[in-house]
UniProtKB/Swiss-Prot annotation:
Source organism per UniProt: Pseudomonas putida (strain ATCC 47054 / DSM 6125 / CFBP 8728 / NCIMB 11950 / KT2440)
PANTHER family per the UniProt record, alphabetical: L-2-HYDROXYGLUTARATE DEHYDROGENASE, MITOCHONDRIAL (PTHR43104:SF2)
Presence of the UniProt keyword Methyltransferase in the record: no
Gene name in the database record: mqo3
Protein name as catalogued: Probable malate:quinone oxidoreductase 3
Keyword hit for Ribosomal protein: no
Length: 539
């Protein structure tokens, strides 16, 4: 059968097609900065840029219908203000000597975070500090002769740094009972224990910080937030800018943005998005997803009697994020205790991701490095298998090593977020497992992404400052940016570890602005009084 298309109908169809193309073209907007991901990293970078270049236009694209719903959500992370006060993996022992360099680096980074948060409070960007940060003592808690020996050596080594002067050490059951009564009830009085206790630790709600950041940014005329929008494609324009296409998951509409600078702070999704951009620098990376679950209690009779983040020591071959800890938390306005994490496995790169994430991120460039790491890190593989096979009874028995009188009926299991451990190509070893965070940038600095996990959100402010140094090097060196950065971070360019007087000054300043009670002097441990029984719950 012959089909005849009338000229008028053909012209109408052509006009419609042209109109659709024009509409699609109209949907492509131009901005100075496009941020993919609505978590703590992207929002921190946006706040930095708002301070340094308030005239720049910015757009944030988030796949979910709210910001801070993946890794930044308080329920999906441990909420620790990582300062290396209790985390034993930051002080490895080499040839009989404790190396504190990484611990000092982590602590210095958190001092930058404290100053950045304090500045945002002063500017009215953040409100009510107790809604997002609270004083919570950090404790290392170990048993067994080898672990006790290690902890004592660690304590002695850290005393060389003014950053760790408030730390106290004890093997005395009665003293430990004063600090953490819940952990001592029902414990064998003859069990050898050792702890370090640092009252100046913090519990941080990174989700709340993110929500307040974005809420403020939305009041700015040059900031636009796109929720329920998933990035579909990333391509390079002829002028060197980036063309990002995304789809609204609610109504199916599509849009695109051209950006002079593109930042990918999408948590576990950062790796596949960097790969999508086609930059050579992303080809050297692979990722292995590791999830975590926690036992949780909100029973006030229990939660009110523990005021610490008590960290143990990781099992052989276990990743740093697996270090068991019994934590005081404040989430959704309620005081809780979380214990874990227990490693879980899923091929998803995000808690609300796809089971195809791992497969989709595997390429000819990173497959061999991933295989090599799998063979060489067999202890890690065995650890993950053992964790996945754990029963509820196994997890509860692990809890009872920290809280001997725990009762099953008071606790529930909560599935927290996903983390993607970095695997990087290595010429000598084929591939290496990178435990930490890593900034990946293109050669010309027009695109950057953040990969990795711990210490993560605790160091968002210094990490984003590092991003600025990499992609806007000349701007950072300019007198205008230098002056503003030093106004926000008074210790910028100074190692506080080498300047005790400056450290004292910054601690007093941030304690006051962030309302971290009791006011603490890092140089005078005797001025520190243990947190009282009301603790965070009274706030």
């Amino acid at each position: 059968m012959k089909i005849t298309i009338k000229p008028k109908l053909a012209m109408a169809g052509l006009a419609l097609a042209i109109g659709m193309l024009n509409a699609q073209a109209a949907e492509t907007r131009k901005v100075d900065v496009l941020l993919v991901g609505g978590g703590i990293m992207s929002s921190t970078l946006a706040v930095w840029l708002n301070e340094l270049e308030p005239g720049w236009s910015m757009e944030m694209v988030e796949r979910l219908d709210k910001v801070a719903e993946e890794s930044s959500n308080g329920w999906n992370n441990a909420g620790t203000g990582h300062s290396a006060l209790a985390e034993l993996n930051y002080t490895p022992e080499k040839d009989g000597k404790i190396d504190i360099s990484k611990a000092v680096e982590i602590n210095e980074s958190f001092q930058v975070t404290r100053q950045f948060l304090a500045w945002q409070v002063k500017q009215g960007v953040l409100k009510n500090p107790h809604s997002f940060i609270n004083t919570t003592p950090h404790m290392s808690f170990v048993w067994g002769d080898d672990n006790i020996r290690f902890l004592k050596k660690r304590y002695e080594a850290l005393q060389a740094s003014p950053l760790f002067k408030p730390m106290q050490y004890s093997e005395d059951h009665e003293q430990i009972r004063k600090w953490v009564p819940l952990m001592m009830e029902g414990r064998d009085p003859n069990q050898k224990l050792a702890v370090t206790w640092t009252p100046i630790g913090t519990d941080v709600n990174f989700g709340e910080i993110t929500r307040q950041y974005v809420g403020y940014l939305q009041t700015r005329p040059n900031f636009d937030l796109k929720l329920s929008s998933e990035v579909q494609d990333i391509t390079r324009n002829d002028d060197g800018s980036w063309h990002v296409e995304y789809k609204n998951l609610k109504n199916g509409s599509k849009a695109a943005t051209d950006a002079r600078f593109l930042f990918i702070g999408a948590g576990g999704a950062a790796l596949p998005l960097l790969q999508k951009s086609g930059i050579d620098e992303a080809k050297n990376y692979g990722g292995f997803p590791v999830g975590g679950s926690f036992l949780v209690t909100d029973n006030p009779a229990i939660a009110q009697r523990h005021m610490a983040k008590a960290y143990g020591i990781a099992a052989t071959g276990a990743p740093p994020m697996s270090v068991p800890h019994l934590d005081t938390r404040v989430l959704d306005g309620k005081r809780l205790i979380l214990f874990g994490p227990f490693a879980t496995f899923s091929t998803k790169f995000l808690k609300q991701g796809s089971l195809l994430d791992l497969l989709a991120s595997t390429s000819v460039h990173n497959a061999w490095p991933m295989v090599r790491v799998g063979v060489r890190e067999f202890d890690l593989v065995q650890y993950l298998i053992g964790q996945v096979l754990q029963s509820d009874d196994d997890r509860f028995e692990a809890l009872r090593t920290y809280f001997p009188e725990a009762k099953k009926e008071d606790w529930r299991l909560w599935q927290a977020g996903q983390r993607v451990q970095i695997i990087k190509k290595d010429e000598a070893l084929g591939g290496v497992l990178k435990l930490g965070t890593e900034v990946v940038t293109s050669r010309d600095g027009s695109i950057a992404g953040l990969l990795g996990a711990s210490p993560g959100a605790s160091t968002a402010a210094p990490i984003m400052l590092d991003v600025l140094n990499k992609v806007f090097k000349n701007k950072v060196a300019s007198p205008e940016w230098q002056a503003k950065i030093k106004q926000i971070i008074p210790s910028y360019g100074i190692r506080l570890n080498d300047h005790p007087d400056q450290l004292e000054k910054e601690w007093a300043y941030t304690n006051e602005v962030l309302q971290l009670e009791p006011p603490v002097s890092p140089q005078r441990p005797e001025s520190i009084r243990p947190a009282d029984s009301q603790g965070v719950a009274s706030r």
